[in-house]
């Protein structure tokens, strides 16, 4: 009888289930059933085995049966008794057995460290004895490698394994045997490579094992699956384990691994809650079934920890670890212990015990330093323990190898954002360091957004949008802030989350800053609707914000709100400032009253920098000249007494120095020129001081850009202005950009910027000045490219600017300047047309320029009559008028006559060319018709010829078919001749006769014989009934002997001889009576 593990489709592995022991005194046999008859104490068998002098194999078979039934200690005891019976070399295999038995015991999960070490020591001692008897036996070699493996000496095990395999191959080579791979050595090598984390090499060996021995135990499919799992191919891993379980349903390792795969699939591949519930429920059910049979398996216990954690039973998670897993930790793989410790860390974290959580995460990393989740947990506990710098270091080290991890980018972004927002950190760090913190936070959070959106099936955490918006606000990039805050709003609306009041308020603020007052007002009102009447402070703030948005469109309403707010809360400084500002801006308050109010406000709040800044602005913009000096004094006092870093005071003083520098620059006095340079330097120093305090202060940055531009350093000025535009896209910034482009002679870009200002910022006050600047840009471009059209564009803009000043006083210097420009443009257009080639001008253009010249002369006369006009000397103006009335006018009239004659000539030439072209077209059409007709006739002729050829070919085919039929009939008659028997009798004679003929005379007969043979074979295939022929004297066929002989001779003949004898062969055919025709 045999015990077999049957695997469908493969041969079975079998162990003996019974043993027959012969009795020494008789020929009888004593049978032992190895399944049921094994005694609990192996000494009961010793008497029988010793008295009957049983062979060593009987002892080993019984011991092996004990081991197969889980009684390894009894098997060891039996073999130890056998050592007393056998001596010398017979003990070799016994020691080998004991080695493997002790190695097997050392793998037990419930052993202590001391017990495991004892078993390994016993295995080592027995292995030494076994090697002493037989060092080259493969069983001893494998045991040596296995011993190294269990002690964790993987490098030594690999090295030893390679040496043993080489020695075996060398022995095979010496013996003349073919070396074959040893499955057990391959299995050990695959396991060692896996432990060394060389998963690809390990996978290849496991696959090789599967090919060599598909029923090998342990199943290579489990190793294949483990390698695939480590190589991030979970689908192939699960398939491998499922196949192993299918072949052996009792394989515990395979069933546990399949269960792990089910848990993973339920979390990663569930498309909705329903599928997750079904998959997770099935996994839990399978866990329950497997755990009932393997309650001490550490992997299953760790899975139970996972289940209880998600259930919220954190104490049970900790109990499983401390009371069950920790007891057998020496026998558990480190990766399993690491996972179990990790869940303990999470449980402590959930219970709020962050110190113990930190310890458990550290313990998890000690067991497996690659445990990513444990590293994340460690960093989070550091945050909870207020170790922010340490947590950043932890996460940054983790980021080096996990850049694409969404959660890691989110955490790092939030940590750096927290440092950027922290007021204490801001005070103790420089502006550059603060900017670096901001940039790092944005880098990580924007990468988090990119990674999350790329998945297309995950929602972004709305807080990420909020923080990014806030970070861009610190950089004064309000448009970008608005974009991200709007995305946060969309996200909240999508998940139907109640929108916080703060989000609506901030959105409104960003819309206000970007100039969309209507949208801002609407959002402020939405926010106010969410506030209860009891929350008075929030209500007042929103009322103030609503008033700010209505200042442009409804000043009365804004003033009313400010008055209400200040009456209820007199200490609301911002409302009082805005109220006074509106009154002053609309001239609703007398200067003396305004001065009194401002002084009262300042006296009550002398140290308030907002009020001091407003007071400085008032002094600067009041009509009294004395206030300019007061403004300077006031700003200096602010810097000296109250705050040396006040941005408004510093910028105001810097602006003053710029004004002084400009005035000195106009003077021709060298001292004034030197004073101008010093003033510019002082202004630069003040602007730079502001930027040190606030790196994103756009007013200081624009001041620096203006100084660079006025110093002809246009490149740096342009770069700064572009950055300022990104933060504050207002009219001044765009105009300054246009000025720089104009100075750099990039007229196209300058024109584009001026036109953008006109479209985007519809400011009636500045529109005429911008139109004049736009005309100037077109004029500069026209001079460069010598284009009349560009002069016309410049003229159109200048005229539009002049029309907008109809209501202004005629004494305005700006109007005089524009009129002069218009007159000058008319003269310039006339001069350009006069000098241009007739090909590039028209009669109408010259006529228009004559009219324009008249208009220009009128404007010059008008300006000449004005006493206050002093742009150019009167004498020069009179010379221009005289030049226009005489030389210019007569030159234009001549140009007009020349142009008319030129255009008449051109018109005549065009008409003549058109006629010639039409005639050529008609001729060409005639040629084309002729060619088309010739082509058609040719095609018809070809078609007719083709048809005739087809008819002739058809006739030839029919004739050939008729000839073939007649030839076939003749062949049938010759084959059925009555002379067949006579011909058969003469075969030997003819053969001898023909062999004596010359080669020339036999050549034709060989060819004819070959032809006849073909016809004979055809007849055999047709299988027709032969009829007697009436053609006497002819034979129906040639003999096979003749054909064979003639074939041999034909192969020896040369091609030249064959060609020479063709005619002779034909004559011989007629003479010979051989049946050929």
Curated annotation (Swiss-Prot):
Where in the sequence is Phosphoserine found?
1015, 1017
TPR repeats, residue ranges: 56-89, 138-174, 183-216, 218-251, 298-332, 338-371, 373-405, 421-455, 462-495, 501-534, 540-572, 664-697, 699-731, 732-764, 768-801, 830-863
Provide the GO biological process annotations: DNA-templated transcription termination; G1/S transition of mitotic cell cycle; mRNA 3'-end processing; negative regulation of mitophagy; positive regulation of transcription elongation by RNA polymerase I; regulation of transcription by RNA polymerase II; regulation of transcription initiation by RNA polymerase II; regulation of transcription-coupled nucleotide-excision repair
This protein's UniProt keywords:
Activator, DNA-binding, Nucleus, Phosphoprotein, Repeat, TPR repeat, Transcription, Transcription regulation
Show the segment(s) annotated as Disordered: 959-1077
Keyword Metal-binding in the entry? The reply is no
One example of the protein's molecular function in GO is: RNA polymerase II-specific DNA-binding transcription factor binding
Q: Which Gene3D superfamilies match?
A: Tetratricopeptide repeat domain (1.25.40.10)
Enumerate composition-biased segments (Acidic residues). 1042-1051, 1063-1077
One GO cellular component, as annotated = nucleus
Q: Where is the composition biased (Basic and acidic residues)?
A: 959-980
Q: Where in the cell is it found?
A: Nucleus, Nucleoplasm
User: Where would you say this protein principally sits, based on its record?
Assistant: nucleus
Annotated function = The PAF1 complex is a multifunctional complex. Involved in transcription initiation via genetic interactions with TATA-binding proteins. Involved in elongation. It regulates 3'-end formation of snR47 by modulating the recruitment or stable association of NRD1 and NAB3 with RNA polymerase II. Also has a role in transcription-coupled histone modification. Required for activation of RAD6 ubiquitin conjugate and the BRE1 ubiquitin ligase which ubiquitinate 'Lys-126' histone H2B.
> Subunit arrangement?
Component of the PAF1 complex which consists of at least CDC73, CTR9, LEO1, PAF1 and RTF1. Interacts with SPT6. Interacts with FACT subunits POB3 and SPT16.
> What is noted besides the main data?
Present with 12900 molecules/cell in log phase SD medium.
Protein name per its UniProtKB record = RNA polymerase-associated protein CTR9
Q: Which organism is it from?
A: Saccharomyces cerevisiae (strain ATCC 204508 / S288c)
Question: Quick one: which gene encodes this?
Answer: CTR9
């Amino acid at each position: 009888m045999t015990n077999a593990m049957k695997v469908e489709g493969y041969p079975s592995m079998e162990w003996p289930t019974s043993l027959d022991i012969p009795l020494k005194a008789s020929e009888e046999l004593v049978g032992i059933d190895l399944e049921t008859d094994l005694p609990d104490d192996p000494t009961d068998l010793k008497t029988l085995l010793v008295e009957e002098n049983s062979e060593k194999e009987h002892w080993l078979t019984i011991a092996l049966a004990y081991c197969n039934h889980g009684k390894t200690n009894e098997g060891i005891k039996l073999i130890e008794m056998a050592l007393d019976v056998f001596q010398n070399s017979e003990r070799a295999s016994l020691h080998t057995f004991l080695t493997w038995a002790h190695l097997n015991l050392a793998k037990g999960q419930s052993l202590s460290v001391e017990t495991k070490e004892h078993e390994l020591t016993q295995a080592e001692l027995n292995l030494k004895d076994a090697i002493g008897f037989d060092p080259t036996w493969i069983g001893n070699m494998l045991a040596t490698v296995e011993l190294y493996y269990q002690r964790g000496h993987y490098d030594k095990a690999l090295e030893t394994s390679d040496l043993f395999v080489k020695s075996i191959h060398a022995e095979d080579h010496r013996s003349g045997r073919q070396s074959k791979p040893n499955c057990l050595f391959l299995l050990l090598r695959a396991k060692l490579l896996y432990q060394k984390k060389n998963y690809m090499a390990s996978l290849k060996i496991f696959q090789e094992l599967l090919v060599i021995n598909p029923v090998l135990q342990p199943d290579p499919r489990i190793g294949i699956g483990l390698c695939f799992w480590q190589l991030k191919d979970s689908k192939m891993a699960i398939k491998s384990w499922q196949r192993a379980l299918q072949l052996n349903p009792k394989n515990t390792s395979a069933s546990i691994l399949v269960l792990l795969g089910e848990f993973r699939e339920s979390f990663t591949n569930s498309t909705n809650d329903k599928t997750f519930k079904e998959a997770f429920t099935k996994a839990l059910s399978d866990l329950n079934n497997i755990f009932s049979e393997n309650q001490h398996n550490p992997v299953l216990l760790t899975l139970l920890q996972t289940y209880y954690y998600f259930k919220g039973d954190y104490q049970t998670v900790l109990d499983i670890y401390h009371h069950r897993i920790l007891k057998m930790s020496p026998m558990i793989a480190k990766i399993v212990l690491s996972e179990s410790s990790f869940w303990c860390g999470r449980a402590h974290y959930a219970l709020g015990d962050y110190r113990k959580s930190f310890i458990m995460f550290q313990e998890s990393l000690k067991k497996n330093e690659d445990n990513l989740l444990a590293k994340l947990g460690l960093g989070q506990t550091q945050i909870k323990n207020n170790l922010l710098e340490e947590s950043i270091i932890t996460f940054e080290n983790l980021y080096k190898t996990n850049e694409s991890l969404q959660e890691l980018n989110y955490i790092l972004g939030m940590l750096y954002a927290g440092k950027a927002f922290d007021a204490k950190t801001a005070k103790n760090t420089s502006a550059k360091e603060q900017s670096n913190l901001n940039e790092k936070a944005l880098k990580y959070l924007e990468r988090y957004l990119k990674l999350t959106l790329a998945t297309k099936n995950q929602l972004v955490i709305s807080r990420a949008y909020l923080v990014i918006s806030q970070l861009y606000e610190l950089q004064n990039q309000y448009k970008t802030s608005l974009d991200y805050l709007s995305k946060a709003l969309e996200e909240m609306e999508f998940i139907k989350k109640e929108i916080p009041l703060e989000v609506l308020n901030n959105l409104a603020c960003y819309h206000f800053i970007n100039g969309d007052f209507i949208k801002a007002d609407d959002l402020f009102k939405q926010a106010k609707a969410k506030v209860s009447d009891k929350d008075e402070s929030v209500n007042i703030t929103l009322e103030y914000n609503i008033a700010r948005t209505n200042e442009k469109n409804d000043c009365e309403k804004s003033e009313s709100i400010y008055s209400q707010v200040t009456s209820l809360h007199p200490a609301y400084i911002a409302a009082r400032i805005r109220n006074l500002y509106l009154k002053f801006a609309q001239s609703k308050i007398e200067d003396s009253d305004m001065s009194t109010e401002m002084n009262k406000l300042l006296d009550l709040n002398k140290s308030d920098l907002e009020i001091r800044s407003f007071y400085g602005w008032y002094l600067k913009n009041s009509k009294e000249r004395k206030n300019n000096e007061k403004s300077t004094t006031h700003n200096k006092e602010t810097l000296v007494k109250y705050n040396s870093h006040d941005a408004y005071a510093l910028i105001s003083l810097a602006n003053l120095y710029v004004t002084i520098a400009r005035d000195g620059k106009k003077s021709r006095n060298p001292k004034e020129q030197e004073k101008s340079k010093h003033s510019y330097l002082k202004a630069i120093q003040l602007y730079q001081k502001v930027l040190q305090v606030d790196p994103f202060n756009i007013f200081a940055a624009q001041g620096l850009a203006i100084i660079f531009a006025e110093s002809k350093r246009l490149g740096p000025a342009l770069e700064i202005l572009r950055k300022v535009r990104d933060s504050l896209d207002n009219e001044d910034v765009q105009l300054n950009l246009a000025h720089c482009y104009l100075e750099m002679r990039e007229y196209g870009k300058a024109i584009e910027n001026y036109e953008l200002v006109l479209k985007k910022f519809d400011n009636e006050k500045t529109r005429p000045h911008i139109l004049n600047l736009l005309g100037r840009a077109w004029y500069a471009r026209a001079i460069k490219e010598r284009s009349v059209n560009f002069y016309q564009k410049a003229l159109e803009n200048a005229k539009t600017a002049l029309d907008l000043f109809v209501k202004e006083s005629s004494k305005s210097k700006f109007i005089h300047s524009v009129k002069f420009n218009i007159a000058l443009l008319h003269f310039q257009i006339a001069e350009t047309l006069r000098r241009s080639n007739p090909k590039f001008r028209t009669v109408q253009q010259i006529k228009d320029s004559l009219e324009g010249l008249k208009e220009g002369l009128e404007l010059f006369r008008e300006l000449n009559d004005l006493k206050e006009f002093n742009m150019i000397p009167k004498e020069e103006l009179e010379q221009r008028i005289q030049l226009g009335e005489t030389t210019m006018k007569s030159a234009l009239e001549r140009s007009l006559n020349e142009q008319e004659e030129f255009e008449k000539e051109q018109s005549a030439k065009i008409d003549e060319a058109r006629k010639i072209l039409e005639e050529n077209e008609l001729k060409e059409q005639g040629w084309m018709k002729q060619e088309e007709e010739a082509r058609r006739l040719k095609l018809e002729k070809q078609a007719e010829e083709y048809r005739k050829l087809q008819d002739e070919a058809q006739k030839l085919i029919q004739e050939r078919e008729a000839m073939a039929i007649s030839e076939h009939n003749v062949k049938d008659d010759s084959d059925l001749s009555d002379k067949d028997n006579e011909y058969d009798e003469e075969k030997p004679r003819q053969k001898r006769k023909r062999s004596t003929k010359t080669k020339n005379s036999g050549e034709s007969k060989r060819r004819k014989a070959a032809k006849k043979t073909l016809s004979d074979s055809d007849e055999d295939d047709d299988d027709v009934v032969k009829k007697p022929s009436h053609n006497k004297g002819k034979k129906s066929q040639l003999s096979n002997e003749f054909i064979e002989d003639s074939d041999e001779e034909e192969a020896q003949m040369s091609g030249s001889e064959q060609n020479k004898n063709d005619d002779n062969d034909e004559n011989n055919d007629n003479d010979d009576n051989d049946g050929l025709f």
